[in-house]
Amino acid sequence: MSTTGRHHPLYVAQTRVFVSSSRYGTKDISAITIEVNMYENIGLPYITGRLIIIDSANASNAVHFQGQERVTIIVLDSEANPIMNKEFICVGIDFSQKVGDDKSGFSVKLIEEHVLLSNSTRFSKVYEGKPDAICNQICSEQLGVSVTPEGSPTQSDMRVVFPFTTSPLEAANWMAARCTNANGIPFYFYSTMDDNNLQLKDISNLLGQGAFNADDPYIFGTTSNKGAGQEEDWDILSKKITNYTINNNEDTLLAMARNVFGGYYNFIDTYEYGGEEIKYQLTDPLETLPKPNGSTTYNYDPAFTTGRPYHEGQNTYTSQVVTRKLFDDKFSFLEEDTVDKHLNKSKSRAIYAFMDQQPINVTVPGISFGFDKLGQQMDVYIQKDIPPEEKSNIESVRDKKRSGTYLVQKVMYTIFNNRLTATVTATKTSTDPSLGAEQLNQN
């Protein structure tokens, strides 16, 4: 990629891309890489990437991508300081096209190395300990990457036997999914751009943190104060939302299918208490989550009824046969000593699905956003549509439903011509208590 000398909130100074392989030395392909994309997802323990290359320098022969090369991406700020340095493994070329008599374009897929190691590894081993410790031990031993925990799972020490058909990341995901706090709230297991360790974090802790841009939100609306012939103020540019979309969300039928609101469970203990039926209700774990801005609940109305509230219904009937005392001295993977502790599995799955009920996508300047915001909360201000003749101020035009605090769940970083943008998928975690007093505009 080219070098820019602009000290601008939207641009990086340089983006350097290097490729290395045991077949040849390190090669700098920055000049022919026209676009870099990197993808974070709070639900995945790995990061993926993509390079768009316009080849007019014989790169396809000189570099000869085969899906095994090591790719290093370095982003430098205006002072030539590295603000991001990430290493990937090339996993192939997903398309190639001739774009002229003397050049062609192709897209190179990238992924973190520990994913390739996991996919090429099958192991069988017995582990003992709490599920978060076992998750870390698997990743450290099998993949060479550590897991940084935040929060303390309530599950007891257990003994887990993994069969030889299991890959390391599959086993680690099992253990991460087994982690809940005492209220049944699950943990996210994911990878971030700014830390080589994997993360395992209690959702309650993530929701309890303040927004990294508190009182200085990203803004979608009329934000410019520039005069004629002037450039837009850089402070405004650094927090301006350039694109805002809402995907399919708040899907009640899908939530029901996922047992988000309620469910009927039968845990059959083969050791002592036999079968015991118990109802799961969404209101129970919701009551334990942090609620900012004076909210009384998250985006669910427990009083709504067309016969009965959703959480009092049962969308499915689930039976699980659970042993106890499979081992004399420790629990096995699925064992608990009470039905209430078994119910944490149901609460965990429901809250995990509930977190996807109200996402939005916003595109913001990548320089101000940085590479360390996955799993953090951000403040967003969305301007609502108003009639042009209506008098307004910054508070009256605020969209109270869409403005507020969001948890960053996915980020796509795009670098094109050294312009860095971050497209963020985030879920609303705060509700304005005055929202219910809003009136329809009948004019």
Can you describe what each PLM-predicted range is?
Residues 23-35, 83-91, 121, 210-224:
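Short amphipathic beta-strand/extended segments with alternating polar/hydrophobic composition
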Residues 131, 164-168, 182, 191-193, ...:
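Active-site-proximal structural scaffolding
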Residues 77, 131-137, 141, 221-237, ...:
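Short, cationic low-complexity segments
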Residues 59-150, 159-161, 176, 202-204, ...:
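Surface-exposed cap/loop segments at beta↔alpha junctions
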